[in-house]
């Protein structure tokens, strides 16, 4: 709705702007909570069996986005609680203006998720339906299209207005890392993160497996002893969980792709990964998809799986994700823009359609991380104000949920 895609910004040339850094963005006011940077109507299935119906409904409503995810595979109460936490977070995310929840059975799970989402975001238009109650998939698609159409009408007149950047929550992610990630891409994102935090905003990064070997550095940046203890604890828990099944985190990290890109050990990879969080104190450690409510820099305890980790922070309430890659990744997200940053000139040339910003000038000595970090910050604010990220323009709307426990 009113979004435009800027082709090749930061990819074809070094910008290095000198104008003042923006301290406001254009977003959508919500009746409760933070403003959004998108005005999405999402069609959210609450179980895997409702995915197709959700997709067919979304296809009939211009601008609607279906949010299918990796199968529900719930294997116990703890796992079910985690899945519900992600779905509730998605339904109450700041970029979501309205929600249609689609259930398979008439068991009330959709109503439970709607109720919890409304506790977080009172006044949000949310409708629920079940395929069983409608009398089957064909009738459900017809009824869902009517419900979704009404929701689309309810949010159609929303207009952007100015807000301070202190309202923004930026997420950071890396995937398909190579040597250039730690040398340039992640440091540039770190500069951008520091700028936003200094303007009163919030930054969250995750992927606990990729803090291993660098957790002591993050712990030294903790705002207090309890936060430092939690940082050490979540990394130790990952290794303990791997050992319990006869594996080690280092056994799968770095990946073959990481090693082909010049990374030799998990410690080397982690030292580069944590740079995307900038240099400010760590305020706390959040559980998977836990709401991000504080200011400053936060860590979230997630696996290293890119789609899962991005979705967790989106469900936690982040507005957008800045994703660094050296080997290349097309990944997007259903409820937030995912901006791609790459410092590998060969990868940028090969996959230019998938990138928003090139940090390759740092590698070639044409720019500094500080100057490019400011440019990235400006681009981030443009995306927050409506410019489409590459993944959005292409239509990458991935979403995934982490599952725990043993399948029945």
Stretches with model-predicted labels:
Residues 2-320, 324, 329, 333-408:
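Metallocofactor- and cofactor-centric catalytic cores in central/energy metabolism, strongly enriched
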């Amino acid at each position: 709705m009113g979004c435009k895609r800027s082709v090749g910004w930061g990819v074809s040339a070094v910008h290095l702007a000198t104008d003042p850094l923006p301290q406001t963005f254009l977003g959508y006011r919500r009746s409760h909570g933070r403003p959004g940077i998108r005005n999405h109507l999402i069609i959210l299935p609450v179980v895997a069996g409702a995915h197709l119906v959700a997709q067919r409904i979304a296809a009939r409503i211009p601008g609607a986005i279906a949010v299918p995810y990796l199968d529900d595979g719930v294997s116990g109460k703890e796992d079910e609680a985690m899945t519900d936490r992600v779905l509730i977070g998605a339904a109450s995310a700041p970029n979501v203006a309205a929600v249609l929840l689609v259930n398979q059975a008439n068991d009330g799970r959709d109503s439970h998720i709607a109720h919890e989402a409304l506790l977080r975001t009172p006044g949000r238009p949310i409708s629920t339906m079940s395929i069983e109650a409608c009398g089957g998939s064909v009738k459900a698609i017809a009824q869902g299209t009517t419900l979704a159409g009404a929701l689309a009408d309810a949010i159609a007149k929303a207009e952007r207005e100015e807000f301070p950047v202190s309202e923004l929550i930026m997420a950071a992610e890396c995937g398909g890392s190579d040597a250039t990630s730690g040398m340039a891409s992640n440091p540039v994102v770190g500069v951008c993160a520091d700028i936003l935090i200094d303007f009163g905003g919030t930054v969250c990064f995750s992927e606990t497996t990729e803090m291993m070997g660098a957790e002591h550095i993050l712990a030294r940046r903790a705002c207090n002893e309890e936060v430092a203890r939690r940082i050490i604890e979540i990394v130790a828990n990952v290794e303990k969980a791997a050992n319990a099944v006869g594996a080690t985190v280092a056994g799968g990290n770095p990946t073959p792709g990481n090693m082909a890109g010049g990374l030799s050990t998990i410690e080397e990879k982690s030292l580069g990964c944590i740079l995307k969080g900038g240099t400010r104190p760590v305020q706390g450690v959040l559980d998977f998809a836990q709401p991000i409510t504080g200011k400053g820099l936060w860590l979230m305890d997630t696996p290293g799986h890119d789609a899962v980790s991005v979705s967790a922070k989106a469900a936690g309430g982040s507005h957008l994700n800045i994703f660094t890659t050296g080997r290349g990744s097309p990944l997007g997200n259903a409820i937030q823009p995912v901006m791609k940053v790459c410092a590998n000139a060969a990868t940028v040339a090969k996959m230019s359609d998938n990138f928003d910003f090139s940090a390759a000038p740092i590698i070639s000595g044409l720019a500094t991380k500080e100057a490019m970090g400011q440019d990235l910050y400006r681009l981030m604010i443009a995306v927050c104000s409506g410019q489409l990220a590459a993944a959005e323009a292409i239509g990458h709307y991935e979403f995934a949920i982490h599952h725990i426990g043993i399948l029945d």
